[in-house]
Curated annotation (Swiss-Prot):
This is Recombination protein RecR. The lineage of its organism: Bacteria, Pseudomonadati, Pseudomonadota, Gammaproteobacteria, Pseudomonadales. May play a role in DNA repair. It seems to be involved in an RecBC-independent recombinational process of DNA repair. It may act with RecF and RecO. The gene is recR. PANTHER family: RECOMBINATION PROTEIN RECR. Disulfide bonds: none annotated.
Length: 200
């Protein structure tokens, strides 16, 4: 089917969203144009306002409308712990655990094949933040449990060890409520390697 230039432009714009292919973008565009024009207008306004008003926190680099995000602006947070994550979405996930320390958001993970080295993802800024703050006794490496995430955590841990700082890695393994027969071998091996005594 051939769409008019404006409809084609809308479909192509919607396709930049993760997980949205050609068919889904077409359905979204036609839904907005045929049945929910007020919703489309609200979406356009919200998107425009967010693109104009949302930037990065000057301390942790997560997304925020202020100079400091709510976590960095909160004086009650634990200044001895720094949690390093790959992206802003990970901050929201870690917050759900009740973690009360500070954050540093990388711009992804190390990926030499994609041209992403330490500078590209912000490791020099991370090390500068740790040195400037001077209060962190533990750096929690909460990068994703992928080959690249593990390599990134290992690289950062080596840099921290050279400075005499403690790095810890979040545990990986069997999900709570999961059944062993449904867990892949790599995940199960990681869980066995990271086993610990039961606290009584």
């Amino acid at each position: 089917m051939s769409f008019s230039p404006l409809i084609r432009q809308l479909i192509d714009a919607l396709r930049i969203l993760p997980g949205v292919g050609q068919k889904t973008a077409q359905r979204m565009a036609l839904q907005l144009l045929e049945r929910d024009r007020s919703g489309g207008t609200r979406l356009a306004q919200a998107l425009s306002q967010a693109m104009e008003g949302v930037g990065h926190c000057r301390q942790c680099r997560t997304l925020t409308e202020q100079e400091l995000c709510p976590q960095c602006a909160d004086p009650r947070r634990d200044d001895t712990q720094l949690c390093v994550v790959e992206g802003p979405v990970d901050v929201y996930a870690v917050e759900q655990t009740g973690y009360r320390g500070r954050y540093f958001v990388l711009k992804g993970h190390l990926s030499p094949l994609d041209g992403l080295g330490p500078e590209a993802i912000g490791i020099p800024q991370l090390m500068a933040r740790i040195e400037e703050q001077g209060t962190f006794s533990e750096v929690i490496l909460a990068t994703n449990p992928t080959v690249e995430g593990e390599a990134t955590a290992h690289y950062i841990a080596q840099l921290l060890a050279e400075k005499g700082l403690t790095a810890t890695r979040i545990a990986h393994g069997v999900p709570l409520g999961g059944e062993l027969e449904l867990v892949d071998g790599g995940t199960l091996a990681h869980a066995f390697a990271g086993r610990r005594p039961i606290a009584l």
